[in-house]
Amino acid sequence: WFVWRPDQREPIQLIAGGSGVVPLLAIARSHSAAGNQSPIRLLYSVREPTAAIHAAELEELASRDDGLILTYAFTRIAPPGWNRPPGRVDAALLADCTLPAELSSTCYVCGPTGFVEAVADLLVGAGHDPARVRTERFGPTGGIR
């Protein structure tokens, strides 16, 4: 579940898959509006550059908020000259592009169910406190109805 308050001072790690960026954008907006100086990073996984929702606003927010670092991960098509091949979020990408577990950040993960479960498992495997990994998911759960 996602609850972020402007008086929270711990670092914030946001990880979005596709349209899961929408609630995380709200956190980033609130963080900026509050003038909160705690570190905040957003790793945004999309199929290709044209699939990034609110890309212009995210990039503008990152350019004016010294605390926000925005990183894209492209799963199918990366833009020319991109520094990584297309692929899913994995342990190596998280190690390179997210806050280390030692900072005791609160991690917010939102996206399709499979994405959220995989990323949450990777975060815990990297040493993040499971109590600080907050998730929101959408889509099928795999159960029969």
Question: PLM features: what roles do these ranges have?
Answer:
Residues 1-145:
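FNR/FR-type flavoprotein reductase catalytic core
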